[in-house]
Amino acid sequence: MLHSTKLVFRATPQALCFPVRSYSRYVRTVPKTASAKTTSKLAPSITTEDEVAEQDPSLQEPQSATSTASFAFHDAPPETRSVLNSSTNNNIDWSDSYHGLGSQPFSREIADILLAPIKDQDIEIKPDGLLYLPEIKYRRILNKAFGPGGWGLVPRTESLITKSQISREYGLICHGRLISIARGEQDYFGGEEKVTTALEGCKSNALMRCCKDLGIASELWDPGFIRKWKAKYCEEVFVEHVVNKKKKKLWKLKSNKKIEYPYKQL
């Protein structure tokens, strides 16, 4: 009787200890949804900058101006605005400012240079009949009127690049005043290696458009002057493409005896 009691006594601790050991190894799993709810209640919500931008469209960075092309310049004008008043530190952000625009006219001496008639021999004509003044002529007139260093062309936006064209907005500054704003554009062909040259053409186009507000070479926008100048100095001739043999009409100066390749005069 005593022996059986011992057996029962020995078995009882084993039976009692076994569930305890197995319970210590058991880890209760918490559902993922419940865990997320508990975490959100205990810890403050942390929102990343990307999530904030998604929630508020106004905080999103503007889409790159080169969204239709596979490359970009990333040449947006730097932020030069200061917390202080611009009149205190003489710091003007020309990418955003209209300082001096239309404030007062230039002197009579400068106006006479800007409004002087252009020479007939300085005008050129494109094959499609468009008259133009070479860019260097505009720069010489500006240098004569304001002096070298007295004027400048500043970019006001990032370059907009597409698969076949580049454009950018520029502002013409003369004697510390904004004079004119224009967007230049230039077509290009041949891939990315042609974009840099096209950007210079875009700048030249913007300079020409800004100079129009100063009255430089204003005759080139006068239909009467255009008709008279064409009749006196130009002629329209039939030409043939040397490769595909297509025929068309092109304009040229009477002083130019030859048609440029790939055309030949009929």
UniProtKB/Swiss-Prot annotation:
Keywords: DNA damage, DNA repair, DNA-binding, Mitochondrion, Mitochondrion nucleoid, Transit peptide. Its main location: mitochondrion. Residues 37-47, 57-68 have a biased composition (Polar residues). The keyword Ribosomal protein does not apply. Residues 37-68 are annotated as: Disordered. GO terms for biological process: interstrand cross-link repair; mitochondrial genome maintenance; recombinational repair. GO terms for molecular function: double-stranded DNA binding; single-stranded DNA binding. InterPro entries: Mgm101. It holds the Pfam family Mgm101p. Residues 1-23 form a transit peptide. It is found in: Mitochondrion matrix, Mitochondrion nucleoid. GO terms for cellular component: mitochondrial chromosome; mitochondrial nucleoid; nucleus. Forms homooligomers in vitro. Belongs to the MGM101 family. Plays a role in the replication of the mitochondrial genome and the maintenance of its telomeres. Able to catalyze strand annealing and D-loop formation. Binds a wide variety of DNA substrates. Exhibited the highest affinity for DNA molecules carrying 3' ssDNA overhangs (Y-form, 3' FLAP, 3' overhang) and for substrates with complex structures (X-O and Fork). Forms homogeneous ring-shaped structures at the ssDNA native telomeres ends. This is Mitochondrial genome maintenance protein MGM101. It comes from Candida parapsilosis (strain CDC 317 / ATCC MYA-4646) (Yeast).
